[in-house]
Amino acid sequence: TNEHKFEAGTPRIAEAIGWSAALDWMDSFDLDAEHARLVKIASWVAKELRAMGMTVYGRHEEHDAAVVSFLHPTINSEDMAHLLDSRGFAVRTGHHCAQPLLNRLGITGTVRASFYVYNTREEAEGLVQELKEITEKFA
């Protein structure tokens, strides 16, 4: 018998080719070096945000992830995210699957910026600059 006659629909050929190309692209990176580069960027962003008077959650001096969660003392996190989005920056807001922790901290949500292999230092600098402008205008 031909077992292929029992498969419904078209095989996911394009998806398999795309997945293979994505894996090849990821193999082109030295992931340890990329991780170190991204952690350095996240640590710099955290330092800049603290200097602007924002609360940064996490220990960025011993940072092991390229993620910065922060909160401005007077600008709502959802408003901050909307303003950043309108300026071309994609961030996340809300509980980030950590609602019990945020409840314990007495906050309703944070803004989270995440950096990955396709992000540059210049983009991080642009994010910080936009946050400075937003803070000056709306705080």
Residue ranges and their predicted role:
Residues 1-139:
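Pyridoxal 5′-phosphate
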